[in-house]
């Protein structure tokens, strides 16, 4: 269980947001309200997707690092950077995929960044990009939700995240108008079970504390909530007397939300998953003496310097993860309606040892 400072305050704020009905409307994160921009068409989205796939495939087949980073941003850029480190170390590769025919969810929006979602079946070709760290195994072939963004009228379209749905999980129907555009949901909307911008903190409370968390009243159990909690508990093995902690926390990356057909929200967001094994004196701010050797999991080795001495004080790891979650409408007749986290992407990005 995690007990890092700030977790209780974050949970209190998130639970207060659940069921809130008096919050004024606001625009999605990063959107400039009131400006007029042309809508993204299906043809344009198709061109952006095809261009990305062609460049990514060429980069993966040649190992060209500059090309691999040329059309990505946000979570995806950090993920690719880590894959390149894994490839250089020989423990992974720049992941190469084959894609099926995409379907596009085009939001009705004003201002920048402009964005859209490509939903497509993706199959891994060859080695995975880098060793996993969540303990969750996703199939080599599965449906992914790809978020593409354009930061300004003159900026290129870039892929900002790719989140895969576990087998058996589906995306809910969205609220499209007669032209096929989907309504967005303000991140502080009170029309859902929880404000969309509270989805991440509520998920984090369950990942940090498990089924006993108060947030479990509004967040459904599953692979990407209680499953991450269960995996985190055994991800590292602390020596006798040392402490092991983990925390799912927010990031500076923009969140987006689309309205579902039933009035809920499909929310896209990113979180850091931090974990650490350390001698108690570090947490307690006491006199620090070296402890017994800390076991370094094999999947972290490529992120540490070669010849790194066995850590005896602290071992840190960080993952940057993208998620998609379904936030049901407020006042849903079923008392069992909860936030469902349906997709995950990203992975390990950092480790240190002392």
Predicted feature descriptions by range:
Residues 1-10:
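N-terminal export and membrane-targeting signals
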Residues 21-24:
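Bacterial signal peptide processing site
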Residues 87-141, 242-296:
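Surface-exposed, charged secondary-structure patches
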């Amino acid at each position: 269980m995690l007990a890092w400072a700030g977790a209780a305050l974050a949970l209190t704020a998130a639970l207060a947001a659940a069921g809130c009905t008096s919050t004024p409307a606001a625009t999605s994160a990063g959107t400039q309200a009131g400006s007029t921009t042309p809508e993204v068409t299906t043809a344009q989205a198709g061109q952006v997707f095809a261009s990305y796939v062609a460049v990514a495939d060429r980069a993966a087949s040649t190992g060209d690092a500059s090309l691999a980073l040329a059309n990505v941003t946000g979570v995806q850029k950090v993920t690719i950077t880590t894959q390149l480190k894994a490839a250089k170390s020989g423990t992974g590769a720049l992941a190469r995929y084959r894609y099926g025919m995409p379907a596009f969810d085009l939001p009705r929006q004003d201002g920048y960044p402009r964005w859209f979602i490509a939903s497509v079946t993706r199959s891994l070709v060859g080695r995975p990009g880098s060793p996993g760290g969540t303990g969750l195994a996703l199939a080599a072939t599965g449906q992914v939700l790809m978020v593409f963004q354009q930061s300004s009228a003159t900026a290129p379209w870039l892929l900002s995240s790719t989140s895969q749905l576990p087998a058996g999980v589906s995306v809910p129907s969205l609220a499209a108008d007669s032209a096929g555009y989907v309504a967005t949901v303000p991140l502080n909307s009170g029309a859902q079970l929880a404000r969309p911008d509270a989805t991440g903190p509520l998920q984090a409370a369950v990942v940090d504390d498990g089924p006993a968390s108060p947030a479990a009243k509004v967040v459904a159990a599953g692979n990407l909530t209680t499953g991450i909690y269960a995996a985190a508990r055994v991800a590292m093995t602390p020596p006798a007397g040392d402490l092991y902690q983990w925390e799912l926390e927010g990031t500076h990356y923009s969140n987006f939300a689309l309205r579902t057909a039933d009035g809920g929200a499909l929310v896209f967001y990113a979180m850091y998953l931090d974990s650490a094994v350390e001698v108690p004196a570090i947490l307690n701010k006491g006199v620090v003496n070296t402890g017994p050797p800390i076991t370094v999991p094999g999947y972290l080795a490529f992120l540490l310097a070669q010849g790194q001495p066995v850590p005896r004080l602290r071992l840190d790891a960080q993952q940057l993860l993208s998620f998609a979650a379904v936030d049901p409408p407020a006042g849903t007749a079923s008392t069992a309606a909860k936030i469902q986290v349906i997709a995950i992407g990203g992975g390990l990005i950092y480790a240190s040892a002392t």
